[in-house]
């Protein structure tokens, strides 16, 4: 691959990163789809990182805020999705600190109240099981779910 082609791919990736936060895994996947050689992908990723176009800490923080506030995901689901994107555990932990335990419980409570209104089950045990499964699928822990369900009774 010549220098001109490298600059073309670099420019495309810079434009992509300028539109929204991206992580190394996102850019790598995009470049691999276009059959860019691995050594060139590594060079492009390093260049983007050194120029501040990609930053794992910034990406993880934005991802946590978006998924928590907009989609109501819990910390477990957010952490798992960030791990899929190969974000280091220490970066994930630091990003998850941005959402406090109180706001996690409040969001879970709001989600469970909404869900409880749509659950038609009259048996309290089955109703509680449905709400628990729902909250687990959203990425909350058993302890958080138990705590909130206890408040709601």
Where are these regions (language model features)?
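An alpha-helical, amphipathic repeat domain used for nucleic-acid recognition
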Residues: 1-153
């Amino acid at each position: 691959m010549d220098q001109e082609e490298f600059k073309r791919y670099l420019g495309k990736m810079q434009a992509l990163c300028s539109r929204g936060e991206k992580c190394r895994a996102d850019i790598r996947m995009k470049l691999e789809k276009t059959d860019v050689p691995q050594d060139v992908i590594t060079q492009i990723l390093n260049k983007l990182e050194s120029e501040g176009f990609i930053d794992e800490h910034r990406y993880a923080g934005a991802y946590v805020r978006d998924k928590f506030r907009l989609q109501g995901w819990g910390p477990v689901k957010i952490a798992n999705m960030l791990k899929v994107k190969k974000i280091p555990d220490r970066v994930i932990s630091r990003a998850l600190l941005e959402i406090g335990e109180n706001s996690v419980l409040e969001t879970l409570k709001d989600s469970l109240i909404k869900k409880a209104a749509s659950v038609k089950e009259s048996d309290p045990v089955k109703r509680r099981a449905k709400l628990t499964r729902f909250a687990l699928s959203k990425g909350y822990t058993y302890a958080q779910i138990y705590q909130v369900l206890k408040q709601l009774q």
